[in-house]
């Protein structure tokens, strides 16, 4: 059995300000950095050892991953975390022509496919003020519905269409090899993945809540069929 560890990034500065963030590249707050460290501490205490990590291209997810893997060295078996960029990602410069040493290094693969849902015209707006303007039911539908797009943005269905192919083609490959895989990403990109893992339907999505910095561990077979689920509160 392989283990798949999902972590929503720690609290960001705009989480703290109750703003829609989406693709705006906002860093972690002080609390968010602490959440990343606490999550790593819990994983290490339970004896988990990460073989490979995936993140989005957004700094709050990458910060969460790198804090976890550098502050608690036993979590990655004493290996050095190293970001491995893909040529199809926007931040790839062509300079990291380095294959690496799997005995000494733990690869972190950042990908735009795992980015947060794009909130379009809502990005940067305060959620409470937006609810006052448009109504709480409308804002809740924009945030939690599977099919409804916020103005100029993505629905969760749209998000899932980019997350799942990446999961199937990249993440599942490591699961099939028996690796312990960590994914540090976002509420909606992780919801898309959880729908695949737990065979959830669109009507189940509104009740699917993910707290920042709380590890969610799945024990899975080579096809990512889940046999056990653990939440490390």
From Swiss-Prot:
Catalytic activity: (2R)-2-phosphoglycerate = (2R)-3-phosphoglycerate
InterPro entries (alphabetical): His_Pase_superF_clade-1, His_PPase_superfam, PG/BPGM_mutase_AS, Phosphogly_mut1
Catalytic site positions: 9, 116
GO molecular function, one term: phosphoglycerate mutase activity
Site description Transition state stabilizer, residues in chain: 186
Chain residues that bind substrate: 8-15, 21-22, 60, 116-119, 127, 143-144, 187-188
One Pfam family this sequence matches: His_Phos_1
Pathway: Carbohydrate degradation; glycolysis; pyruvate from D-glyceraldehyde 3-phosphate: step 3/5
Keywords for the protein's UniProt record, in alphabetical order: Gluconeogenesis, Glycolysis, Isomerase
Family: Belongs to the phosphoglycerate mutase family. BPG-dependent PGAM subfamily.
Cited function: Catalyzes the interconversion of 2-phosphoglycerate and 3-phosphoglycerate.
Stored HAMAP family: PGAM_GpmA (MF_01039)
Name under which the protein is recorded: 2,3-bisphosphoglycerate-dependent phosphoglycerate mutase
Name of the gene encoding the protein in the UniProt record: gpmA
